[in-house]
Structures are given as structure tokens and as C-alpha cells.
């Protein structure tokens, strides 16, 4: 069962460009990189050379005689004489290149040679990426891949493009969903949120029609992350990295969701955990939401370095890390319980990052003015409020009406609500979050 992914169109566009460079695909483990690359290769090439450096150690010495195309291809065929290189008809797939990052140095030669298309990928590229980047600067294209978003989940469920496009139409026309539409999309979004976007987890759910077995798969992925820390986190305290990661659910459950090191360990200090958060971000496991000094443009230079929130990159993995009672209530009764606010924020943060948005929030100390997210468009700043209830959006109204904040002309509220508009505030259901960038583009905000 192959799931249609957004990278599919990108790969076709990449190949269609007559001057395309070698491609490096980055992303966390088990998000479907290899499946998508192989699917593309089988559809478009007569000859595929697939090398997995994690599983096939015989290929680790292919650079022994240099980085030129002739030496590399010769050593590959020495390691496996069944491999053939057919100019203009072959694609070379280097997988798990974090195990052999110097392979990136060959991309310059392959680019100049022009006889073979090359795609590199790996689960922990963020960690070794500075080394990989310096080895291939000017000779590659980067693509960051994520776990499945809500739209990809709907594709996997069999929904047609026009059905999915209707969500954006409702937003643009400010037209409320009817009761049936709202109920169905809310149910689908809640199922997606519980599952997350890991393809193996989604596949298990679609094959059985239930959540049975999905939690075991999610728990294994989190255990695999622990192993990655122990294997790849050189020069850092591995136990502290794992402790930071495991503390995030409790951090988000606080009323003040700002990340605090004293919640990781008693009397912990930020300097003791230097590099731990960056490691998790580079691995594609977590997201960082920066606190703005002022809710205004520009965003660069307008960040309070010591204030931030951390979210899981995949909300399904966040849910799988909750206590057993909360998980059971959510999976069986669809009740988010005390974690409601935290989960809704993580849903939205994940949707934003997968659309290419940066994450920013604002909280004024010793004051009630705060906002969950801000989205930057071409010349405006859009505050986005995530409400676990239908209460009035006082902070949004205050930001919009304050003449000091000239960059803000309207706001967006995402909640357990229908489509609506009042007092410069657009209201959308949570499941609309994945369409926000398209919505703003259609409104000519970009």
C-alpha cells in the first residue's frame, strides 16, 4: 500500500528541470522518505541503484579511491557486481547517508558529470548536516520531508481532491459547514491527531479500521528515538537529551506552556542542557516556538531568546506519551481531557510547520495580553488564537484594535467551532489549520 505524498509532485518537478542538481531529502526516521523515493524511481527510471549505508556495510568503502564519478561507480560495482550503471537511464539512491556523510562530497562530481540522477536521504541528517552541507555546497538541492499531514491522511482515506478543496472554499467564502460536513471532518481530524502522520501507524489503522496496534507502533518509534540519541548524540549528555524530550508533554500541560528546565530535573539550569534542544530540533523530532518581544514586524531580532515553547513534531507521538488513562479516554471516548489545550496547540504548530511557517507566540509578563501563534505574510502579521473553548477572544481583539500594532489588521481563531467572521476575526474549525497558507495566499496576503 503506497500513500500519495506531497513530495511526489516535488520529485516530478525536480526531474522535469533539465538542469536539476542532486537532491538531499532530510527528515525524521520512519516518515516515509525511502518509500516515496523508491516509488518515484520505479515510475521514472529503467535502472535503479539503491544503496543503504545502514544495512549494507559492504558499500562503506566506495570513496576509498576518491570522490570522482568513475572511482565511486567502479567501487560500487566491486562491492556488488550485479549493479549496472546506464548513463541517462539510471538513478542512484544513497539512503541513510548519516552513516557515511562524506558521500555528499561526490555530489559535485555527479552534478558536473550529468550522466546519473542522484538522491540522498537519511533519518538523522540534521545532526550531520553541517558536515554534509559543507561537502556539497552549490551542488545540491535540499528538501525537508515531514510525517503525513491532514491532507495526506485524507488522501490515504480515499477522499477526492474536490472534497478536500471544499474545506478551503468554505474558508474563502466565509461559509459555515453544514452539520454533517462539520461532524465528519471533526471526526477525521481527531482520528488523524490520535494516529499522527507516521505511515506505518496510518497503514495499521486503515488495514484494521481500529486503533488496535497503533499505540505499540508509536511507542516503538519513541524507543527508536532514544536509540538514535544514544547512537548519534556525540559530545552531549544523552540522558539529558532524552529527559528534555520526555518532559515536553508535562511542560505543555502547564497553564504557562513556556519550556522550563526546572521541570526537566530539580534545580536544572539551561547551561547544563546546552545543545540538547538543538539536537532534538535538528533530528526533526521537536519544534520550537519563539516568544516575540513585541507583536510586530520584523520578526528577526524581535525574539526573547530565553522564552520558548517546545512541541512534538508529530502529535500522535505526543498522545502516545500521555498517561494510560488519558490515552484510553481519548482513543475510546474521543475526550481530550486535561490535555485539551496542549494537544490543540500541538496540532496547530505541526500544521503550520508542515506548511513552511515559522512558529512565534507572544506573552507579556505580568499582563493578560498573550497570543498562541503569529503568522508572517508578505506585509502583515496575523495573530492566531487556539481556543479549546468558545470563549470570546479578548487578546485577539486587543491586538487588532491597538493602534500601536500597525502590522496587525485582522486575526484568526481556530477552535471547536464553525466558520465565522466578526470584528476583524475569522473563525475556523481546527481541521482547517492545514489550509491556512493557501487561504492567506488566496486572500492576497502573500
Language-model segments: residues:
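N-terminal pre-Walker A segment at the start of P-loop NTPase domains
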Residues: 1-16
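Conserved lysine of the Walker
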Residues: 33
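Hydrophobic positions on the alpha1 helix immediately C-terminal to the Walker A/P-loop
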Residues: 36, 40
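Conserved catalytic segments around the Walker B and adjacent sensor/switch elements
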Residues: 44-59
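Short glycine-rich substrate-engagement loop in P-loop NTPases that contacts/grips substrate
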Residues: 55-87
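Structural recognition of the conserved hydrophobic beta-strand(s) that form the central parallel beta-sheet
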Residues: 117-123, 144
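Interdomain motor-coupling "hinge/lid" segment immediately C-terminal to the ATP-binding subdomain
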Residues: 130-253
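Accessory nucleic acid-recognition modules appended to NTPase machines
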Residues: 203-370, 374-378
